[in-house]
Amino acid sequence: MSSGHFFQGHWCDVFKCTMRCLSCTHTLSLVLCVLALTPATLEAGPETLCGAELVDTLQFVCGDRGFYFSKPTGYGPSSRRSHNRGIVDECCFQSCELRRLEMYCAPVKPGKTPRSVRAQRHTDSPRTAKKPLPGQSHSSYKEVHQKNSSRGNTGGRNYRI
């Protein structure tokens, strides 16, 4: 075997070994990264909701119906269990699902339909002041109070001096 062929073969073996080591290093790094990130994703299962987050979520889920912090008696499948558990016990101290949140929504009131835009404009418009009819005097409370106090009228109250 010639020395040139030996060095060429040796360098090929070294190169292959180096590539394998680099490949192993990359693979090991990738595996370590995945393992480092995996526990965070496994632990991040269902969340707990407390305080303002719980209220905001209930408002979103229940909408215009409103919600209760404790279930009304006889409401929902857990009415047979103890009645002292509320939404905080069920969703703040442990995780809860959407179904559990919906159990705390107030029931839909029958016959209550959203107002139409036309009705809203009509009922929400500012009231105009009524004009007194001819021959009637329209005095404000301030004017009446000033008249009564100038006459010495105390409104039925007796004052001693």
Curated annotation (Swiss-Prot):
Residues 115-161 form a propeptide. It comes from Cyprinus carpio. GO terms for biological process: cell population proliferation; insulin-like growth factor receptor signaling pathway; negative regulation of apoptotic process; positive regulation of cell population proliferation; positive regulation of phosphatidylinositol 3-kinase/protein kinase B signal transduction. Belongs to the insulin family. Disulfide bonds join 50-92, 62-105, 91-96. InterPro entries: IGF-I, Insulin-like, Insulin-like_growth_factor, Insulin-like_sf, Insulin_CS, Insulin_family. The insulin-like growth factors, isolated from plasma, are structurally and functionally related to insulin but have a much higher growth-promoting activity. Acts as a ligand for IGF1R. Binds to the alpha subunit of IGF1R, leading to the activation of the intrinsic tyrosine kinase activity which autophosphorylates tyrosine residues in the beta subunit thus initiatiating a cascade of down-stream signaling events leading to activation of the PI3K-AKT/PKB and the Ras-MAPK pathways. Binds to integrins. It is found in: Secreted. This is Insulin-like growth factor 1, juvenile form. Keywords: Disulfide bond, Growth factor, Secreted, Signal. Residues 107-114 are annotated as: D.
